[in-house]
Amino acid sequence: MPEAEMKEEAPEAHFTVDKQNISLWPREPPPKQDLSPVLRKPLCICVAFTCLALVLVTSIVLQAVFYPRLMGKILDVKSDAQMLKGRVDNISTLGSDLKTERGRVDDAEVQMQIVNTTLKRVRSQILSLETSMKIANDQLQILTMSWGEVDSLSAKIPELKRDLDKASALNTKVQGLQNSLENVNKLLKQQSDILEMVARGWKYFSGNFYYFSRTPKTWYSAEQFCISRKAHLTSVSSESEQKFLYKAADGIPHWIGLTKAGSEGDWYWVDQTSFNKEQSRRFWIPGEPNNAGNNEHCANIRVSALKCWNDGPCDNTFLFICKRPYVQTTE
């Protein structure tokens, strides 16, 4: 390569390394070829020291000017950082407190809902109580009015009691008259029934009707005739009845309802009246019943006397007496 080209490509700046510091400055114009190498070297050193001194002075000046400001800024930054840290701590504390307060607010909302529900229930109860109170007041007014009426009636009680006593006495009299009227009506009805039966040929005695036949029949035929008239051959249950019968028979034999079953049987009344054997002893003709010929199983009234009963064959034909109890009918 030609020397001229190498000169053109030579570096146009110089630098030195001093304890890790690098200094760079522009290349001085190429020394004249007439300077000796010994003179060029000290000159370069002086320039380098001069530049270095300028750099140091500039650095010191800059530090003197900007260091206080920089330190102030650093202190401000530290202060701001400390303040921010305090605020962050405060914010963390506030966040925790906020969470606590939020929980309290939630609890308060729940309590508020409970209170609102309770308040609604209380209001409903108050309305119900007001309604009940109104009803009670209305009833109280009615009771007050009724009490006034009671007071008014209380003053009339003595008079009403006297009227009630009079009415009770009058009612007793009316009841007595009504009972008497009913008895009279019963007697009239009884008299009417008796007259009707008498008109049909019956006789009345002590609550019974008696029919004295005009046609003689056997004992069995006579009983069938009585049954057709809702009666039976007569029974005798007292001495007064015995006297009535034999007097009405007037000494003419009449069949009565006393019979027995066979020669060894007991006497009985066909109308189911209980037969009093001891009492009947006073009504038999002396020596009767004798069951003459072992065929006398039916009794008749034979004579006009208290002792008028006689036993005879049931196939004999006699007049007869039917007996029918009087039963009052209601219309």
Swiss-Prot record:
Membrane topology value: Single-pass type II membrane protein
The glycosylation sites are 90, 116
Query: Major place of localization?
Result: membrane
Q: In which tissues is it expressed?
A: Expressed by Langerhans cells. Expressed in dendritic cells and by scattered cells in lymph nodes and spleen. Also detected in some non-lymphoid tissues such as lung, liver and heart.
A single GO BP = defense response to virus
Q: Where in the cell is it found?
A: Membrane
Per its UniProt record, what InterPro entries does this chain match? C-type_lectin-like (IPR001304), C-type_lectin-like/link_sf (IPR016186), C-type_lectin/snaclec_domain (IPR050111), C-type_lectin_CS (IPR018378), CD209-like_CTLD (IPR033989), CTDL_fold (IPR016187)
The coiled-coil segments of this chain are 106-197
What is the documented function of this protein? Answer: Calcium-dependent lectin displaying mannose-binding specificity. Induces the formation of Birbeck granules (BGs); is a potent regulator of membrane superimposition and zippering. Binds to sulfated as well as mannosylated glycans, keratan sulfate (KS) and beta-glucans. Facilitates uptake of antigens and is involved in the routing and/or processing of antigen for presentation to T cells.
Q: What protein is this chain from?
A: C-type lectin domain family 4 member K
Q: Which organism is it from?
A: Mus musculus (Mouse)
